[in-house]
Amino acid sequence: AFAPADSVATFKLQEYGMPKADIATYSPIPLVIGLFLPAFISSTVAADPISVVRLGIPLKLFTCFLSFLVVQATPAAYAYAAQGIGPSTSFLCGFVGTMILHEISGTLIFMSFMSFFNKVADPAIGGTYMTLLNTISNLGYKWPNSLALFVLPKITTPELDGYTIETMAGFIIGIV
């Protein structure tokens, strides 16, 4: 459900006119938030990790939808880039806000899983069981991104962008 926003959105932003320099300029903002966010949410997550996942997944779905809207607004925002007119402040605020929400929701889900793995891991065998659970979790999280990138050119037609199809399908699957 999250793969188009995680793996395809940045490529689509570039395809629709956003320069790499703009993406690189605003990317450190959520990175800094992501560095300090675990310190603030660790006490909440440790108490009941599953309830935090129930909060994080709808937030991430909402963020994926916002990411889709930002990608769709990019051609209009950069329509006059050749004349030296950049995107509006509201577009850039929406872009950065979406990146921040994406970072928050991803960190919530990641920390919830780590806290859950910590609760179910057997301390007698050390970190082996937790490492196994984390590896399985990472594989489960990464293969949809690879699949989204692989399928994208196959479902893209001149009439309809494959990113739109993937995003809507992922959003529906995420709701179900």
Q: Which stretches of residues belong to each language-model region?
A:
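Loop-to-transmembrane helix entry
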Residues: A9-G34
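Hydrophobic core of transmembrane alpha-helices in multi-pass small-molecule transporters
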Residues: A77-F116
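Helix-to-loop junctions at the C-terminal end of transmembrane segments
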Residues: G34-L55, P75, L152-P153
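Loop-to-transmembrane helix entry/capping segments in MFS-fold secondary transporters
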Residues: K20-A21, C93, P123-I136
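C-terminal ends and interior cores of transmembrane alpha-helices
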Residues: L59-S88
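A membrane-interface helix-boundary motif in multi-pass transporters
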Residues: P49-V52, F150-G174
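Glycine-rich segments within core transmembrane alpha-helices of 12-TM secondary carriers
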Residues: S27-L31, L133-L149
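Conserved extracellular-gate-facing transmembrane-helix segments in secondary transporters
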Residues: A1-D6
